[in-house]
Design a protein with these regions (language model features):
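Short, Lys/Arg-rich, polar N-terminal cytosolic tail immediately upstream
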Residues: 1-13
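A structural signal for multi-pass alpha-helical bundles of membrane permease subunits
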Residues: 14-300
Length: 300
């Protein structure tokens, strides 16, 4: 209504109009996120299996997990994965982002090349690396031709080497993804800061540590949090490189791999798998909150 009392011609909005537009997205979140999570929590307190329902067993599944050596092996592998992979995915993409920002002929090709693994299927990436790392694969063939080894390096047949190989695949696939994050952050660094430092005699290395790193530190914390969550959820790399057993004796299994194995394997222990899933969720939540706290502390 105008000041003169006339009708503006604009449609009349009621209080529920915004909620009407939010409803489709809200329904999707409830259907595909909240409901599965609630159902997982409920099932974790039962002895349910794939082909039958289960009765309430209280905290038995959680007690079993905490007393299960396989659970602790998988937890140790997941935490080790995080400790190794996260620093690599925080530092290496930053170095790449700085390099591809340079005005070098043909640098556009390298930008695309670094990002290519991101858009490739995780299964395809795993199969490529399986061919590269197997006993008669590319790496071992080169090593033998150069007389660096007499026997093939057991990249895929030793649990420790398998875990390291999977870490390499994860880092390789994540480099281009997190490089884009850093490119966005570097674009917000004022060029005048580098120019002033150069005039004062600061070299490229000093400018990097004195200007670039402090300016992109919030992004480094974000990348650290995201890569930590991703590292705790790793499954495909272990499955493709190590097979359904998770390497020799299951020694390279991570928590997501263990969840799949007990929940969808021959025993089909859905209730126990859900309990392990909740424990993985809590572990992920701890690292997420830690990353959030560090980010807030940096902003303060």
């Amino acid at each position: 209504v105008t000041a003169g009392g006339g009708d503006t011609g604009l449609p009349h909005r009621t209080w529920w109009t915004p909620y009407l537009f939010l409803a489709p997205g809200l329904v999707m979140v409830l259907l595909f996120s909240l409901w599965p999570f609630v159902n997982t929590v409920v099932l974790s307190f039962t002895d349910a299996r794939i082909l039958r329902g289960g009765g309430y067993v209280g905290l038995d599944n959680y007690r079993r997990a905490l007393a299960d050596p396989d659970f602790w092996v998988a937890t140790g592998n997941s935490v080790l994965y995080l400790v190794v992979v996260v620093p690599c995915l925080v530092l290496l993409p930053l170095a790449l982002a700085v390099l591809v920002q340079a005005e070098i002929p043909g640098i556009g090709f390298f930008r695309s090349a670094f990002y290519t693994p991101v858009i490739a299927s995780a299964v395809v990436v795993g199969l490529i690396w399986q061919w590269v790392l197997r006993s008669d694969g590319l790496v071992n063939t080169v090593f033998r031709r150069l007389h660096l080894v007499s026997e093939p390096v057991p990249f895929l047949t030793d649990s420790t080497m398998l875990l390291v190989s999977a870490m390499i695949v994860t880092v390789w696939k994540g480099l281009g993804y997190y490089m884009v994050f850093y490119l966005a952050a570097l674009g917000n660094v004022p060029a005048s800061l580098h120019e002033a430092a150069a005039i004062d005699g600061a070299g490229p290395v000093r400018r990097f540590f004195s200007i670039t790193v402090p300016q992109v530190k919030p992004m480094m914390l974000l990348v650290g949090t995201l890569s930590a969550i991703s590292a705790l959820r790793v499954f495909t790399e272990i499955y493709i490189l190590g097979g359904e057993g998770g390497g020799p004796g299951g020694g390279a299994r991570t928590l997501p791999f263990l969840i799949r194995q007990v929940g969808l394997g021959f025993s089909g222990e859905t209730g126990y798998a859900c309990a392990v899933s909740i424990l993985l969720f809590l572990l992920t939540l701890v690292f997420s909150l830690l990353g959030r706290r560090l980010t807030k502390g940096d902003e303060a």
